[in-house]
Amino acid sequence: MKSHTQSLLAESLNALKQQGIVPADFEARIQVDRTKDKSHGDFATNLAMMLTKAAGKNPRELAQLLIDNLPESSHVEKVEIAGPGFINFFIDDNALANQLMAALNSDTLGIELPASQTVVVDYSSPNLAKEMHVGHLRSTIIGDSVVRALEFMGHKVIRQNHVGDWGTQFGMLLAYMEELRAANGEQAKMELSDLETFYRAAKVRFDESEEFATRARKLVVALQSGDEYCNKLWREFNDISLSHCHELYERLGVSLTRADVRGESAYNSDLAQVVADLDSQGLLSESNGAKVVFQDEFKNKEGEPLPVIIQKADGGYLYATSDLAAMRYRSNVLNADRALYFVDLRQALHFQQVFKLAKTAKFVREEMSFEHMGFGTMNGEDGRPFKTRSGGVVKLIDLLKEADIRALDLVRSKNPDMDEAELAEIARVVGIASVKYADLSKNRASDYIFSFEQMLSFEGNTAPYLLYAYTRVAGIFKRAQDVDLSDAKIILEHEKEKDLGTKLAQFGEVMARMVSKGQPHALCGYLFELAGAFSSFYEACPVLAAETEELKKSRLLLSQLTAKTLKQGLNLLGLETLERM
């Protein structure tokens, strides 16, 4: 309905241009918004006020002219002018009911899909040779929910797990493994828990022993030069790390696979060419022996230009170099229309600089969009970054295990007589959903407080509340299995029926926002409001005990569409649903 309203206004504006009321070359973005007050209709626009200066008329006069030139539409019941010149549209109840019927019979809930694009999504991207910790959670689940939404909206999505699989840390690990195998033979274990120990012990050795540090640096050079022994060990480290990552992805219900991994090492052979191409364009400068690029747009507090370091004085490359190579690949090989980077907000300046440099150096197509989808920090209840009691980093697996335990206690308290196997399965779904939803329901650009108590509550905008809301709606159909809905149609007469129908019709608008802005919290908020609208409808409008058979069937259809929308929305967030809680 929103896009239909915009189309009506576009035709009216063209008519005013043809009549000479508005200059023919005037370009206006037609903004149509949902009204917050039902007395103001369903949609409102400030188009008349935008035209005032160009047309030389007062906005209320222009509003009337726009209304007079609107094409006829069976979707619109009436149009009114409000305030200084707002135009309010009231949608016809029958048109809304028809839209809802179409949504019921559609795999995409009746959403008008946009033109398909190829979208690269860079997310999760942990450093290998370490266990994933809670700091990886936000990128992983926010990115994955947006990926699901993009695919649902008909886009071709290329997942890119840009893992940190290269660099000095591998020299330290290789050197320490040599020491370990010298002491214990080839039987030295390579389990993931050992990798954590290896890393810490190797770092201590690197910091304390110059001989060890020298050996580690030589091993990095050997690794970069293709040494067979070093590469074999490096692949072992990476394989163990990736196995751990994908166990966590599976537990979290994240769609990343091994095929989506394209780490820093994938661009090693391209880095020298990046430097050479920047140099040939006269973009490189030297600063303290390093090769850097200065861009006028980026300065420090003193007004001095901030460099993008491309190559260190010792010849080593940095994140900017591999990011530029990756951008080139994503633009010119993958031929993407958009590239979305789900990376901590603290990297905002870095991405602003490399995005600008890639365009300046013509490494990427001018029309391609690069977007940093930054996110804030997950904090403990003390407001500080989430840590263990001893101040250490919280492993992601430990967080998920605790969520399982707490969810099991919660579910058991609600269902003391339930079979243990069923309890465990429900607790698994509730635990993972609660952790994910608590994050996804917050504006990604904001920091948030992690609280098991809040996220496992059945009250408020939480996963348990929404999962229960879904089971409540789905339960209606278990009691109405003998009702034939083949000839049923939706009727919107009661105020709460209209409210629920209006909320259901907003799903497409919310999805459009989620994919354009990368904001899962918009979908979370919508699902919470939808569950509330259904609750109000259910209390005011008897379903199985409706006054007439026709009304019962209509309300069953509204319930069916609510269940379908809740389930689809939760699945797009990466959450499983339950038929019983």
Curated annotation (Swiss-Prot):
Cellular component, GO annotation: cytoplasm
One of the Pfam families matching this protein, by short name: Arg_tRNA_synt_N
Keyword line: Aminoacyl-tRNA synthetase, ATP-binding, Cytoplasm, Ligase, Nucleotide-binding, Protein biosynthesis
Location of the protein in the cell: Cytoplasm
Gene3D superfamilies with a match to the protein in the record: Arginyl tRNA synthetase N-terminal domain (3.30.1360.70), HUPs (3.40.50.620), Isoleucyl-tRNA Synthetase, Domain 1 (1.10.730.10)
Main location: cytoplasm
Biological processes per GO annotation: arginyl-tRNA aminoacylation
SMART domains: Arg_tRNA_synt_N, DALR_1
Enzyme Commission number(s): 6.1.1.19
CDD domains: Anticodon_Ia_Arg, ArgRS_core
Residues of the signal peptide: none
Chain location of the short sequence motif 'HIGH' region per the record: 126-136
Domain of life: Bacteria
Regions crossing the membrane: none
InterPro entries, sorted: aa-tRNA-synth_I_CS, Arg-tRNA-ligase, Arg-tRNA-synth_N, Arg-tRNA-synth_N_sf, ArgRS_core, DALR_anticod-bd, Rossmann-like_a/b/a_fold, tRNAsynth_Ia_anticodon-bd
Disulfide bridge partners, by residue number: none
Catalytically driven reaction(s): tRNA(Arg) + L-arginine + ATP = L-arginyl-tRNA(Arg) + AMP + diphosphate
Complexes and interactors: Monomer.
HAMAP family: Arg_tRNA_synth (MF_00123)
Similarity section: Belongs to the class-I aminoacyl-tRNA synthetase family.
Full protein name: Arginine--tRNA ligase
Organism name: Shewanella pealeana (strain ATCC 700345 / ANG-SQ1)
